[in-house]
Amino acid sequence: MSRLAKKPIPYPENVKVNYVEKEHKIVVEGPKGKLELNVHPDIKVTVNQQERWIKLDRPTDRSFHKAIHGTMAALVKNMIKGVTEGFTEVLEIHGLGYRAQLKGNVLELHLGKSHPDIYPIPPDVKIEVKGNEIHIHGIDKQRVGQVAAEIRSFRKPDPYKGKGIRYKGEQLKLKPGKAVGKK
């Protein structure tokens, strides 16, 4: 990752990037919103407003600095992508009678329990329900993934029948049931 981090990270014209040196904070603002990132104090940040790029530099080639350098570069790239395009995660609901519905700013999940599971939707994330799919949209990749994981945790896929909530495209390896032997 650290080789990719050595290159300057370009950003489009509709994105504004600022670095607040006192607070070690990068602020990225774009058409979809604004994101902030606290940068590790060892990482030096250079923002070129004219040529529209941001560069991160590490003080040494120690493995810790290489790791944190690559991580910070990946986070900045995700911030730029988030404020321009946004991120989407899709969950699928499998199971007879399993369904989801939106009620205001709350997601109500009926997952075969005696009561519906209620998930309050965070203000920085947008959720849509289309049939048996839940679409989660947002500008912060980490937040979108966290919300998807929290919703999935209400009913993870069953290893025998595959019932539950899963990510779109997630492959399940179903276990065989109990084998009835001869007597």
Curated annotation (Swiss-Prot):
Disulfide bonds: none
Record-level GO cellular component terms: cytosolic large ribosomal subunit
Coiled-coil features, chain-numbered ranges: none
Pfam families given in the database record: Ribosomal_L6
InterPro entries in alphabetical order: Ribosomal_uL6-like, Ribosomal_uL6-like_a/b-dom_sf, Ribosomal_uL6_a/b-dom, Ribosomal_uL6_bac-type, Ribosomal_uL6_CS
GO biological process, one term: cytoplasmic translation
Keyword rRNA-binding: yes
Keywords per UniProt: Ribonucleoprotein, Ribosomal protein, RNA-binding, rRNA-binding
GO terms for MF: rRNA binding; structural constituent of ribosome
Subunit composition and interactions: Part of the 50S ribosomal subunit.
Role summary: This protein binds to the 23S rRNA, and is important in its secondary structure. It is located near the subunit interface in the base of the L7/L12 stalk, and near the tRNA binding site of the peptidyltransferase center.
Family under the similarity heading: Belongs to the universal ribosomal protein uL6 family.
Protein name listed in UniProt: Large ribosomal subunit protein uL6
Organism this protein belongs to: Aquifex aeolicus (strain VF5)
Taxonomic path: Bacteria, Pseudomonadati, Aquificota, Aquificia, Aquificales
